[in-house]
């Protein structure tokens, strides 16, 4: 398997250069992505990186701390996806693209999505390495659609946008809806009318 060989090389390279912490996070992220967070352990991450448990515990106090780091990485991936999807767009087009990128992430990475929100809940302001919070493009779009874009973003409009988008994404990540379910576009369309009825 080419992907597994690549991961082994990446792990060895990361540790060789002294970046064991990043190697452990990468290993844990791949495990969560494929099998979920429940069956993972810090000792397993250490074995995967080819180091002792003691070496791993120098970077993470326990499994919970490692999984929090993985959740932060998951939010960074979501933010990157959102930024790419909304590049060059504004207003309603940005809002729609941002919402779909969020939903697409939940469909493509359901286990990472669930882990991220089990750790951070609705607080999507987490930033890492200069990457804006996962919800930033949705917030910017809501602000652009306000009657007076110069004013602070309307918290009620933002809450509505997040509640609808996150609700859809959660249903998809749990397997209750499919990404192409007609209710997805219907729910987005209705919520967008509530956010910017005249635009």
Give short role names for the model-derived ranges.
Residues 20-29, 45, 70-74, 78, ...:
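Generic hydrophobic, amphipathic alpha-helix propensity
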Residues 1-19:
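N-terminal intrinsically disordered/low-complexity leader segments
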Residues 23, 27, 31-65:
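Helix-turn-helix
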Residues 96-117, 125-132, 162:
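Helical hydrophobic small-molecule/effector-binding pocket
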Residues 32, 41-42, 63-74, 113, ...:
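Amphipathic alpha-helical segments enriched in hydrophobic/aromatic and basic residues
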């Amino acid at each position: 398997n080419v992907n597994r060989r690549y991961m082994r090389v990446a792990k060895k390279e990361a540790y060789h250069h002294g970046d064991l912490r990043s190697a452990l996070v990468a290993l844990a992220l791949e495990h969560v992505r494929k099998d979920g967070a429940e069956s993972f352990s810090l000792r397993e991450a250490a074995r995967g990186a080819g180091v002792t448990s003691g070496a791993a515990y120098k970077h993470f106090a326990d499994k919970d701390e490692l999984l929090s780091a993985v959740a932060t990485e998951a939010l960074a991936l979501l933010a990157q996806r959102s930024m790419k999807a909304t590049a060059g767009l504004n207003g309603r087009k940005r809002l729609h693209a941002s919402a779909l990128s969020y939903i697409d992430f939940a469909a493509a990475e359901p286990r990472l999505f669930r882990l991220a929100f089990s750790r951070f809940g609705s607080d999507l302001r987490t930033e890492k390495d200069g990457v804006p919070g996962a919800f930033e493009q949705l917030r910017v779009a809501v602000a652009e659609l306000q009657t007076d874009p110069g004013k602070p973003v309307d918290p009620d409009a933002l809450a509505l946008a997040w509640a609808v988008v996150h609700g859809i994404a959660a249903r998809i990540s749990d397997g209750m809806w499919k990404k192409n379910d007609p209710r997805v576009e219907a729910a987005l369309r209705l919520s967008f009318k509530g956010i910017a009825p005249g635009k």
